[in-house]
From Swiss-Prot:
Active-site annotation: 99
Provenance organism: Pectobacterium carotovorum subsp. carotovorum (strain PC1)
Name the record gives this protein: Catalase-peroxidase
A GO term, aspect molecular function: catalase activity
Covalent link (Tryptophyl-tyrosyl-methioninium (Tyr-Met) (with W-98)) residue numbers: 225-251
HAMAP family xref list: Catal_peroxid (MF_01961)
Subunit structure, as described in the record: Homodimer or homotetramer.
Claim: Cell inner membrane is one of the keywords in the record: no
Region (Disordered): 1-20
Amino acid sequence: MDENKTKPAGKCPVMHGGNTATGSSNTDWWPNALNLDILHQHDTKTNPLGSDFSYRDALKTLDVDALKKDLHALMTDSQEWWPADWGHYGGLMIRMAWHSAGTYRTADGRGGGGTGNQRFAPLNSWPDNVSLDKARRLLWPIKKKYGNKLSWADLIILAGNIAYESMGLKTFGFAFGREDIWHPEKDIYWGSEKEWLAKSTGRYGSDDRTTLENPLAAVQMGLIYVNPEGVDGNPDPLRTAQDMRVTFSRMAMNDEETVALTAGGHTVGKTHGNGDASLLGKAPEGTDVGEQGLGWHNPTGSGKGRYTVTSGLEGAWTTHPTQWDNGFFHMLLNHEWELKKSPAGAWQWEPVFIKEEDKPVDVEDPSIRYNPMMTDADMALKVDPEYRKISERFYQDQAYFSEVFARAWFKLTHRDMGPKTRYLGPDVPQEDLLWQDPVPAGRTDYDVDVVKARIAESSLSISELVATAWDSARTFRGSDMRGGANGARIRLAPQKDWVGNEPERLARVLVVLENIAAATGASVADTIVLAGNVGIEKAAKAAGVNITVPFAPGRGDTTDALTDVESFDVLEPIHDGYRNWLKKDYAVSPEELMLDRTQLMGLTAKEMTVLVGGLRVLGTNYGGTKHGVFTDREGALTNDFFANLTDMKYTWKPYRKDLYEIRDRKTGEVKWTATRLDLVFGSNSILRSYAEVYAQDDNKEKFVNDFVAAWVKVMNADRFDLAE
């Protein structure tokens, strides 16, 4: 090889055979291209444990008592490289667990502590997560010891639980079962800002703080929920109360839970701002290899202990910050407060007057005492009328406060895990909670063939059977494991009245299916899924393919009493590319919306492609529209959608916004109409490659088989009991 070709002057003396870091990407060249990467995250290729590893099975061998004993010991085993405040790591571990679980938001179910995502960017480097890299390193010896039996996701949350227990709180319980991911999540929208802690104005439609952009549940980029100094760093407890009410509600918390969590989180530990925050080093993701993933190097003093800088606020909230008590409310409600600046220059509230013995002691020297402090969010609990009433009640009744907090903490740390059937371990509470979306156990002792025969003999069409089953199952979100066909909530409020479920058509179909369920002993939930299966089997037969759609009985029927109507509002579909429907025009393109829904359902690009092609020819479009029904054999499960989409005898002409006519190139005759959701499978190079596979003459049966496999995946997405 000519050395002159491999060593151009001033450039890297290596031939660039791979794009590992600095080369231009497709996104750089075509920033508006459809990003299918979000459908192919967390592939087995990135998982070092291998595709045959079962965390559920590994957990069965975990010595939980020994683990908890080790965590209790860790809390007071202060390490010189990162010493514990007052000799107790409780406050740090609670903040780590809180900031892991607290990223959850109800709008799309994303975020939360269910995947151990705090280990990766951007969360590992958020300004609100300063020093949590140290918390995880303190846990590493325990993770190393228990290995594959214990995920990081479970350990991070459990460490917070044990921290509270070690300081005197009786917790409500704990469930294992969170599985780790192995690279950053690509599907979560954290905001459009390009600057940490940028002014919040870009997230709001007006000065009204309730207009926070959906699906966000934090007021600024890089914060977990609200700014502790006040709105955009300007102290005003009443305005901050507005932010709290919005952000906590988007984490599924009511006013009482909000007060409990805020006060309970600040009953222990302290804030850190005894230094110059501008001197902190780079966040973990941007550090040199020699730092080994530890960030925010602090050159002030020892850079740790009393010199630690995190939020910039400085001080403890209570007199005894390593014990669970009612000290927070005692301090907040019995003192007058004034604004001060911390040593780091952050706004905080300090008492106008306080007895010396009521001040918390220094983290290193108990002979030194400092003023306690309150954040603007803490002061909101005192000045907001509703929060104040709740705070007064908690102050008067420590036992009640402890109970409400323990339940709210359990909800915060488990909300993203889905139904109780996913909970593992010896400390799972027996009580069923409404926010867990309970579903009674279903029956398996009925005759499935009899149910299918009754459905086949009914007056319901293939499109009605398939569309109803699809609508029942499509609500599933792999983000927080909510929704799905189990429970048959499609027959209850609010789902029965959702516009996207075509209430009139749905009611007509449900009457028939509910009667069949009652006559055969099957649950309505199972009957709805079987209805879809029967429709598909009929359609496949019409296409010349005999196939039995796999089915697992056992879905239960839930009730109105077991359904929190308000909490299900966030699951209402406002679009469904699979049924070629948009409730209205949105700023985001229809194909991007379909991609988002596909990711939430846990489907791949190939599965999305085959499902759309199949559902189109089955005539399941919303309202019976004919857009994208590229077939003369509607109701037969053929590959006609793909064959005709890729046929160059046709041309595609727009005739209205986002609508197209498919015309014969020679005659100009309009053959079909289409939406962007149809044509994207021919225009996007990746999706077209899948469409071409299914359009091939030798893949007609493969198309049916792949459609059925993807269909069953959707129908069983919420059958966590099958994993057992």
